[in-house]
Amino acid sequence: MSNMQLDTLRRIVQEINASTSLHESLDIMVNHVAEAMHVDVCSIYLLDERNQRYLLMASKGLNPDSVGHVSLHTSEGLVGLVGQREEIVNLDNAPKHERFMYLPETGEEIYNSFLGVPVMYRRKVMGVLVVQNKESQDFSEAAESFLVTLCAQLSGVIAHAHAVGNIDVFRKPSNLPAYKTFQGV
């Protein structure tokens, strides 16, 4: 990696370590990665194990209204493919891939290039980081290495959020079952 890439990594890691919440860390990550890599989109999908879905939790470049609302089953789309394989998926024409899944809410149909990297912690997928470009291109090995390094840092942040019970991002009041309450004894 070049000195510039190392400086960028250091800056991102320092800001993430100084953040006060998982959501803030994810937003820092997508904004800095999009800027550093000069990509049109950077998104992070976190795995909701209970529902077997990847939920879009942060994005720079996709429709902001889709964040926190769009999800894919673990067997769906290119994000699901990255998670199933537990390895990088690098495509120069993503919409032509058999696993591409069009999600109109995100506006991602205009992006051709796709690089998805699994966020792994102790050999377990916790999410997927994705960068996309309108222009068709294969992302370089340096770009892959940059994202793998950032995903290693991100996995620790997510694992910490799990450990301290700060990852209840998947439980919204509408998703919780109705509990019956009883008055009295």
Where are these regions (language model features)?
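Allosteric cytosolic regulatory segments
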Residues: 148-156
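GAF sensory/regulatory domain recognition
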Residues: 31, 43-67
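Signal-transducing coupling segments at domain and membrane junctions
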Residues: 64-65, 92-113, 133
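Signal-transmission linkers at sensory-effector interfaces
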Residues: 1-24, 35, 126, 160-185
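Regulatory sensory and allosteric helical modules in signal-transduction proteins
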Residues: 55, 64-99
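Short hydrophobic/glycine-rich mini-motifs in sensory/regulatory modules
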Residues: 119-129
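A short, aliphatic-rich beta-strand micro-motif
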Residues: 112-120
